[in-house]
């Protein structure tokens, strides 16, 4: 993936403003609520019976935080995103058997919570860079499936 200086600046700027402990749980909870079939991978997380249970679930919150920290690894290594996510790609495909389409669903939920957080600062240019970054992450997480 080729990154312009502007895209690098935008992506780093976005992530520097994010509170992972707040937005991670919101994004992951949203994914489990909006796309309930994604819950099948998280049966060990306990009560996922309804939106309130999901949003109050400590395991869901912890995983959401973990996801954003995982994205942060990509931000810090934008020139080697494939390398950053190679091990996670193998884990999700070979051991966990996660449907790779779910990565896109979660990335959409992350975009929504980031857009809500940034408000008017989430301009079309900002969104384009953010979507390009998330698209690269999704692509490389799904690499083992091909």
UniProtKB/Swiss-Prot annotation:
GO terms for cellular component: blood microparticle; haptoglobin-hemoglobin complex; hemoglobin complex. Transmembrane segments: none annotated. Residues 2-146 form the Globin domain. GO terms for molecular function: haptoglobin binding; heme binding; metal ion binding; organic acid binding; oxygen binding; oxygen carrier activity; peroxidase activity. One of its GO terms (biological process) is hydrogen peroxide catabolic process. CDD domains: Hb-beta-like (cd08925). Red blood cells. Heme b binds at residues 63, 92. The keyword Iron applies. Pfam families: Globin. It comes from the Eukaryota. Keywords: Heme, Iron, Metal-binding, Oxygen transport, Transport. Involved in oxygen transport from the lung to the various peripheral tissues. Heterotetramer of two alpha chains and two beta chains. Belongs to the globin family. This is Hemoglobin subunit beta. It comes from Artedidraco orianae (Barbeled plunderfish).
């Amino acid at each position: 993936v080729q990154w312009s200086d502007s895209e690098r600046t935008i992506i780093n700027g976005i992530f520097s403003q994010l509170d992972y402990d707040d937005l991670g749980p919101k994004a992951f909870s949203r994914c489990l609520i909006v796309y309930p079939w994604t819950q099948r991978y998280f049966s060990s997380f306990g009560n996922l019976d309804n939106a309130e249970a999901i949003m109050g679930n400590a395991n869901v919150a912890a995983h959401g935080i973990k996801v954003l920290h995982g994205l942060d690894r990509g931000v810090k290594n934008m020139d080697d995103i494939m390398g950053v996510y190679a091990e996670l790609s193998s884990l999700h495909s070979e051991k966990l058997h996660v449907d790779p389409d779910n990565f896109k669903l979660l990335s959409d939920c992350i975009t929504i919570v980031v857009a809500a957080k940034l408000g008017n600062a989430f301009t079309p240019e900002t969104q384009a860079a953010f979507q390009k970054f998330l698209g690269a992450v999704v692509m490389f997480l799904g690499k083992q499936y091909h």
